[in-house]
Swiss-Prot record:
Protein name (record): Protein Smg homolog
Phylogenetic lineage: Bacteria, Pseudomonadati, Pseudomonadota, Gammaproteobacteria, Lysobacterales
Coiled coil residues, start to end: none
Source taxon at top rank: Bacteria
UniProt similarity note: Belongs to the Smg family.
Originating organism: Stenotrophomonas maltophilia (strain K279a)
InterPro entries, per the entry: Smg (IPR007456)
Length: 157
């Protein structure tokens, strides 16, 4: 089985980060747990670097622009994110789940993954991790989390 940064991130998110913040262990304990779970130290370190970059790039808390410019995707972004993924990001932004800065952070973190292409499910996990890390995004995170685990996602009203 090919491990990826996303595999490590999903394992961390499902087993540690979704718990109470006080229960999150130090990096050495997390790394030991990941090694015991079968992940390679190389992928673990890449995942920690990904998380460090996410934490360092928190957008400032500001009012979201209602009618901002349309995002034009560049070649590498078009290669990694198919039409469905790009449409999903537009949907989230138009419905106030993501603002433009958060969308850019999601794109940055998606592009930092070691995968040639992301499917919609992978992108949804990236969005969820970004929202989890954003102060003031609790409602958007809760909505996104609900959508992740529903058979038929609810439309926004």
């Amino acid at each position: 089985m090919k491990e990826s940064i996303l595999d490590v991130l999903l394992y961390l998110f499902e087993h540690y980060f979704s718990e109470d913040a006080d229960l999150i262990r130090d990096r050495d304990s997390l790394q030991n747990g990941l090694i015991q779970a079968g992940f390679s130290p190389t992928e673990i370190n890449k995942a920690f670097d990904w998380l460090d970059a996410l934490a360092a790039q928190r957008p400032s808390v500001a009012q979201a622009r209602v009618d901002g410019p349309v995002r034009v995707y560049h070649g590498p972004e078009l290669d990694k994110l198919d039409v469905e993924c790009r449409g999903f990001l537009l949907y989230l932004e138009q419905h106030g789940i993501l603002d433009a800065d958060q969308r850019e952070l999601v794109l940055d973190r998606a592009m930092a993954l070691d995968q040639d292409e992301l499917d919609l499910d992978d992108l949804k996990w990236v969005v969820l991790m970004v929202l989890f890390n954003q102060p003031g995004s609790e409602a958007a995170y809760a909505w996104m989390e609900t959508q992740m685990f529903m058979d038929e996602p609810e439309p926004l009203h």
